[in-house]
Protein backbone atom coordinates (compact mmCIF):
# COMPACT_ATOMS: atom_id res chain seq x y z
CA UNK A 1 0.00 0.00 0.00
CA UNK A 2 1.29 3.44 -0.97
CA UNK A 3 0.31 6.36 1.29
CA UNK A 4 0.45 10.12 0.76
CA UNK A 5 -0.82 13.42 2.20
CA UNK A 6 -2.87 15.96 0.26
CA UNK A 7 -4.68 19.24 0.75
CA UNK A 8 -7.40 20.55 -1.52
CA UNK A 9 -11.08 20.62 -2.41
CA UNK A 10 -12.73 17.18 -2.62
CA UNK A 11 -14.69 17.97 -5.77
CA UNK A 12 -11.44 18.81 -7.60
CA UNK A 13 -9.68 15.53 -6.80
CA UNK A 14 -9.04 13.16 -9.69
CA UNK A 15 -9.04 9.50 -8.73
CA UNK A 16 -11.06 6.34 -8.35
CA UNK A 17 -12.84 7.43 -5.16
CA UNK A 18 -13.18 10.35 -2.74
CA UNK A 19 -14.27 9.52 0.82
CA UNK A 20 -16.24 12.00 2.95
CA UNK A 21 -18.20 11.73 6.19
CA UNK A 22 -21.82 12.30 7.20
CA UNK A 23 -23.02 12.63 10.80
CA UNK A 24 -26.39 11.43 12.03
CA UNK A 25 -29.44 13.52 11.14
CA UNK A 26 -27.92 13.84 7.67
CA UNK A 27 -25.38 16.48 8.72
CA UNK A 28 -22.63 16.83 6.12
CA UNK A 29 -19.02 17.34 7.18
CA UNK A 30 -17.31 20.32 5.47
CA UNK A 31 -15.72 18.14 2.71
CA UNK A 32 -19.11 16.50 2.04
CA UNK A 33 -20.78 19.92 2.02
CA UNK A 34 -18.19 21.10 -0.51
CA UNK A 35 -19.12 18.25 -2.85
CA UNK A 36 -22.80 18.93 -2.22
CA UNK A 37 -22.36 22.56 -3.26
CA UNK A 38 -20.39 21.61 -6.38
CA UNK A 39 -23.09 19.10 -7.36
CA UNK A 40 -25.99 21.53 -6.80
CA UNK A 41 -27.32 19.66 -3.79
CA UNK A 42 -26.94 16.13 -5.15
CA UNK A 43 -25.85 14.70 -1.79
CA UNK A 44 -28.56 16.55 0.13
CA UNK A 45 -31.21 15.21 -2.25
CA UNK A 46 -30.04 11.63 -1.71
CA UNK A 47 -30.01 12.06 2.06
CA UNK A 48 -33.49 13.61 2.10
CA UNK A 49 -34.78 10.61 0.13
CA UNK A 50 -33.51 8.32 2.87
CA UNK A 51 -30.59 6.73 1.01
CA UNK A 52 -28.44 7.38 4.08
CA UNK A 53 -28.89 8.96 7.50
CA UNK A 54 -25.28 9.11 8.74
CA UNK A 55 -25.55 6.34 11.31
CA UNK A 56 -22.24 4.81 12.41
CA UNK A 57 -21.25 1.85 10.26
CA UNK A 58 -23.26 2.89 7.22
CA UNK A 59 -21.73 3.64 3.83
CA UNK A 60 -23.13 4.75 0.49
CA UNK A 61 -21.18 4.53 -2.77
CA UNK A 62 -22.07 7.04 -5.48
CA UNK A 63 -20.92 7.01 -9.11
CA UNK A 64 -20.42 10.00 -11.39
CA UNK A 65 -21.47 12.68 -8.92
CA UNK A 66 -22.12 15.94 -10.83
CA UNK A 67 -19.50 18.65 -10.39
CA UNK A 68 -16.74 16.25 -9.29
CA UNK A 69 -13.69 14.91 -11.14
CA UNK A 70 -13.49 11.53 -9.38
CA UNK A 71 -15.11 8.28 -10.52
CA UNK A 72 -16.86 7.62 -7.20
CA UNK A 73 -17.79 9.32 -3.95
CA UNK A 74 -18.06 7.19 -0.82
CA UNK A 75 -20.21 8.56 1.99
CA UNK A 76 -19.33 7.17 5.42
CA UNK A 77 -21.67 7.38 8.40
CA UNK A 78 -19.94 8.87 11.45
CA UNK A 79 -22.75 8.53 13.99
CA UNK A 80 -23.67 11.26 16.47
CA UNK A 81 -21.39 14.29 16.23
CA UNK A 82 -21.36 14.86 20.01
CA UNK A 83 -20.17 11.28 20.56
CA UNK A 84 -17.45 11.35 17.89
CA UNK A 85 -14.33 10.26 19.79
CA UNK A 86 -11.27 8.05 19.25
CA UNK A 87 -13.28 4.84 18.95
CA UNK A 88 -15.80 6.30 16.51
CA UNK A 89 -13.08 7.87 14.36
CA UNK A 90 -11.13 4.62 14.03
CA UNK A 91 -14.34 2.71 13.31
CA UNK A 92 -15.30 5.15 10.55
CA UNK A 93 -11.89 4.82 8.89
CA UNK A 94 -12.10 1.02 9.13
CA UNK A 95 -15.58 1.05 7.58
CA UNK A 96 -14.36 3.29 4.77
CA UNK A 97 -11.40 1.02 4.01
CA UNK A 98 -13.60 -2.08 4.00
CA UNK A 99 -16.04 -0.43 1.62
CA UNK A 100 -13.19 0.74 -0.62
CA UNK A 101 -11.74 -2.76 -0.82
CA UNK A 102 -15.17 -4.06 -1.84
CA UNK A 103 -15.49 -1.54 -4.69
CA UNK A 104 -12.38 -2.61 -6.58
CA UNK A 105 -11.05 0.97 -6.59
CA UNK A 106 -7.25 0.97 -6.73
CA UNK A 107 -6.79 4.46 -5.28
CA UNK A 108 -8.72 6.78 -2.99
CA UNK A 109 -8.52 10.19 -1.33
CA UNK A 110 -9.81 10.04 2.25
CA UNK A 111 -11.19 13.28 3.73
CA UNK A 112 -12.23 11.68 7.02
CA UNK A 113 -8.88 12.80 8.45
CA UNK A 114 -10.11 16.42 8.32
CA UNK A 115 -12.99 15.75 10.72
CA UNK A 116 -12.11 16.96 14.25
CA UNK A 117 -11.88 14.39 17.06
CA UNK A 118 -12.21 15.65 20.64
CA UNK A 119 -8.83 16.24 22.32
CA UNK A 120 -6.93 14.81 19.33
CA UNK A 121 -4.61 16.57 16.90
CA UNK A 122 -4.35 16.39 13.13
CA UNK A 123 -1.17 14.33 13.59
CA UNK A 124 -3.04 11.78 15.69
CA UNK A 125 -5.78 11.43 13.06
CA UNK A 126 -3.25 10.91 10.27
CA UNK A 127 -1.17 8.46 12.33
CA UNK A 128 -4.21 6.35 13.17
CA UNK A 129 -5.44 6.39 9.58
CA UNK A 130 -2.05 5.19 8.31
CA UNK A 131 -1.98 2.36 10.85
CA UNK A 132 -5.51 1.32 9.90
CA UNK A 133 -4.67 1.54 6.21
CA UNK A 134 -1.75 -0.83 6.68
CA UNK A 135 -3.96 -3.11 8.76
CA UNK A 136 -6.58 -3.29 6.00
CA UNK A 137 -3.92 -4.19 3.43
CA UNK A 138 -2.48 -7.06 5.49
CA UNK A 139 -2.64 -10.50 3.91
CA UNK A 140 -0.92 -13.69 5.06
CA UNK A 141 -0.50 -15.67 1.85
CA UNK A 142 2.99 -17.08 2.25
CA UNK A 143 1.82 -20.68 1.97
CA UNK A 144 -1.00 -20.18 -0.54
CA UNK A 145 -0.40 -21.73 -3.93
CA UNK A 146 -3.35 -19.81 -5.38
CA UNK A 147 -4.41 -16.37 -4.21
CA UNK A 148 -8.11 -15.53 -4.09
CA UNK A 149 -8.23 -12.32 -6.14
CA UNK A 150 -11.82 -11.41 -7.06
CA UNK A 151 -11.04 -7.78 -8.00
CA UNK A 152 -8.10 -5.35 -7.96
CA UNK A 153 -6.87 -4.34 -4.52
CA UNK A 154 -6.70 -0.85 -3.13
CA UNK A 155 -3.09 0.21 -3.75
CA UNK A 156 -2.88 3.96 -3.11
CA UNK A 157 -4.38 5.95 -0.25
CA UNK A 158 -4.15 9.71 0.21
CA UNK A 159 -5.17 11.27 3.52
CA UNK A 160 -6.09 14.94 3.54
CA UNK A 161 -5.53 17.91 5.83
CA UNK A 162 -7.61 21.07 5.78
CA UNK A 163 -4.77 23.60 5.81
CA UNK A 164 -1.60 23.57 3.72
CA UNK A 165 0.45 24.60 6.76
CA UNK A 166 -0.47 21.21 8.28
CA UNK A 167 1.18 19.23 5.48
CA UNK A 168 4.64 18.91 7.07
CA UNK A 169 3.22 17.79 10.41
CA UNK A 170 0.94 15.33 8.63
CA UNK A 171 3.84 13.88 6.64
CA UNK A 172 5.71 13.16 9.89
CA UNK A 173 2.61 11.57 11.40
CA UNK A 174 2.13 9.48 8.26
CA UNK A 175 5.67 8.11 8.52
CA UNK A 176 5.10 7.25 12.17
CA UNK A 177 1.82 5.51 11.40
CA UNK A 178 3.39 3.55 8.57
CA UNK A 179 6.27 2.44 10.79
CA UNK A 180 3.92 1.29 13.54
CA UNK A 181 1.72 -0.43 10.96
CA UNK A 182 4.68 -2.28 9.46
CA UNK A 183 5.72 -3.42 12.93
CA UNK A 184 2.24 -4.74 13.66
CA UNK A 185 2.15 -6.50 10.28
CA UNK A 186 5.51 -8.17 10.99
CA UNK A 187 4.30 -9.32 14.41
CA UNK A 188 1.15 -10.77 12.85
CA UNK A 189 3.17 -12.60 10.21
CA UNK A 190 5.52 -14.08 12.82
CA UNK A 191 2.49 -15.19 14.81
CA UNK A 192 0.90 -16.77 11.74
CA UNK A 193 3.99 -18.75 10.75
CA UNK A 194 4.08 -22.41 11.87
CA UNK A 195 6.45 -23.32 14.69
CA UNK A 196 8.73 -25.35 12.44
CA UNK A 197 9.38 -22.18 10.39
CA UNK A 198 9.27 -19.44 13.02
CA UNK A 199 11.86 -21.01 15.32
CA UNK A 200 13.86 -19.05 17.93
CA UNK A 201 16.70 -18.96 15.40
CA UNK A 202 14.34 -17.51 12.77
CA UNK A 203 13.19 -14.82 15.23
CA UNK A 204 16.78 -13.94 16.10
CA UNK A 205 17.77 -13.69 12.43
CA UNK A 206 14.73 -11.50 11.74
CA UNK A 207 15.66 -9.17 14.60
CA UNK A 208 19.27 -8.94 13.42
CA UNK A 209 18.14 -8.14 9.88
CA UNK A 210 15.86 -5.34 11.12
CA UNK A 211 18.70 -3.95 13.23
CA UNK A 212 21.02 -3.98 10.23
CA UNK A 213 18.51 -2.22 7.97
CA UNK A 214 17.81 0.56 10.47
CA UNK A 215 21.24 0.91 12.12
CA UNK A 216 20.07 -0.03 15.60
CA UNK A 217 21.60 -2.29 18.24
CA UNK A 218 20.36 -5.85 18.68
CA UNK A 219 21.60 -8.44 21.18
CA UNK A 220 20.74 -12.12 20.80
CA UNK A 221 20.89 -14.13 24.02
CA UNK A 222 22.34 -17.64 23.96
CA UNK A 223 21.18 -20.38 26.32
CA UNK A 224 23.98 -19.61 28.79
CA UNK A 225 22.98 -15.94 28.82
CA UNK A 226 19.39 -16.85 29.63
CA UNK A 227 20.43 -19.21 32.41
CA UNK A 228 22.58 -16.47 33.90
CA UNK A 229 19.62 -14.08 33.83
CA UNK A 230 17.37 -16.65 35.50
CA UNK A 231 15.01 -17.09 32.54
CA UNK A 232 14.16 -20.62 33.67
CA UNK A 233 10.48 -20.59 32.61
CA UNK A 234 11.38 -19.79 29.00
CA UNK A 235 14.16 -22.36 28.98
CA UNK A 236 11.91 -25.08 30.38
CA UNK A 237 9.37 -24.55 27.57
CA UNK A 238 12.05 -25.06 24.92
CA UNK A 239 13.86 -27.90 26.71
CA UNK A 240 12.22 -30.68 24.69
CA UNK A 241 12.75 -29.00 21.34
CA UNK A 242 15.43 -30.29 19.03
CA UNK A 243 15.99 -26.74 17.83
CA UNK A 244 18.27 -24.52 19.87
CA UNK A 245 16.62 -21.87 22.03
CA UNK A 246 18.28 -19.30 19.76
Regions of interest found by a model, annotated:
Residues 1-246:
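Short amphipathic alpha-helical segment within the helicase RecA-like ATPase core
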